[in-house]
Amino acid sequence: MKYKDLRDFLTLLEQRGELKRIKQEIDPHLEMTEIADRTLRAGGPALLFENPKGFDIPVLCNLFGTPKRVAMGMGQEQVSALRDVGKLLAFLKEPEPPKGFKDFLSSIPQFKQVLNMPTKVLGKADCQQVVLKDEDVDLYKLPIMQCWKEDVAPLVTWGLTITKGPLKKRQNLGIYRQQLVAKNKLIMRWLSHRGGALDFQEWKETHPGEPFPVSVALGADPATILGAVTPVPDTLSEYAFAGLLRGTKTSVVKSVSNDLEVPASAEIVLEGYIDPNETALEGPYGDHTGYYNEQEYFPVFTVTHITMRKDPIYHSTYTGRPPDEPAVLGEALNEVFIPILQKQFPEIVDFYLPPEGCSYRLAVVTIKKQYAGHAKRVMMGVWSFLRQFMYTKFVIVCDDDVNARDWKDVIWAMTTRCDPARDLTLVENTPIDYLDFASPVAGLGSKMGIDATNKWPGETQREWGVPIKKDPDVVKRVDEIWDSLAIFENEP
């Protein structure tokens, strides 16, 4: 199922019982977070608050609050089908020429999908039905949520920030939280390695002192939203990837005040600039770690224009101790990562990012071990191959007889196959998430790899234990008589 815009997606969700309309008056200040948090933890539906207190614009929360809805947003019916999305990305990251005619025929579906990569530029679009500028720009009229009691101010959370480096051929889409500080100003919290920050740095070097154009889209179609959080290859734009997911080209329209192209179907678009000389102290905010973060200076985004539909929907979320929406997204996108990793490391059997690990801070990898030291190679590969894992603090590597998604299995492997002095790998002075206050220096800390694999000659001088295995004939015989034993039935 493909969706032309957010409303198309919401219609389907409502038909399937995956969307709940809240007609009571609910306050964007704290109350929406409490309701959304309870709903997400119970595996509940997306929420459309139709009567936000003090505002006349509905608020959409919990849109991707279950892995199933993430899969639906990517045009798939099952979470397991996201592996196919990962295979497509692996193909695009390192395409290989067909090995023969039969191989060419099998590649045709992938090449057909590539035809949907270019964007379709429109002359006018629904996202520009209403245009506000100059004194009419007032961000306080948007129902921007304040999520936690100690948050310093309301926070824009689901904005797709659109930038373009002056030396780059394509635009970048990224999602960065934005603190409301004035009727026309937001603090743009982007980390230095993210696409928007890199574009900004490039602009400052080539256009010193000049304002940097920025547009922010809220409420785009699900393929475009998810394209901004997926590990898209550097050579592929998020719009192009959204076209692949949707099966049709992404429709865009030029911003009214700059040359950046924004999703034509967006609900609301903020346009403006960042003055290279203007920064402000951001935070504190409760974030995906479950703690309030430190304050830090970031660039200020000055909004000069707001464009929107005549009856827009404001798309929002909250972040907090897992599970939250980012954790659910991470759980679903886990399936996308696996084929990409397997393309580079075919020995990987499974890869799992437990949601409790704040989406990316801990990874469990199972491999078909082939030689001594293999586990350490995989650890280093996980940390270096995709930038999504540059902040992963812990990597646990197990054999393929271990279920990476079962903590009981993983802990059994760690406690029986791992010697701390021999099998722990510590790497110091590596990039760490700025929100990780456990690191000794902001943005710089250590990583740990745990080799929980069976040890090969050269890794140990001792005879290695042989795992206990049941006799299959006995298992079959007991299966046949099991019901008649009535072990779990109460005696009369």
From Swiss-Prot:
Binding-site positions, Mn(2+): N172, E238
Keyword Metal-binding tagged: yes
A Pfam family hit: UbiD_C
Top-level class of the enzyme under EC nomenclature: lyase
GO molecular function, one term: metal ion binding
SUPFAM superfamilies: FMN-binding split barrel, UbiD C-terminal domain-like
Main location (coarse class): membrane
Catalysis performed (reactions): a 4-hydroxy-3-(all-trans-polyprenyl)benzoate + H(+) = a 2-(all-trans-polyprenyl)phenol + CO2
Keywords in alphabetical order: Cell membrane, Decarboxylase, Flavoprotein, FMN, Lyase, Manganese, Membrane, Metal-binding, Ubiquinone biosynthesis
Entry binding sites for prenylated FMN: I175, Y176, R177, R189, W190, L191, R194, G195
The protein, known as: 3-octaprenyl-4-hydroxybenzoate carboxy-lyase
Organism encoding this protein: Pasteurella multocida (strain Pm70)
Lineage, highest ranks first: Bacteria, Pseudomonadati, Pseudomonadota, Gammaproteobacteria, Pasteurellales
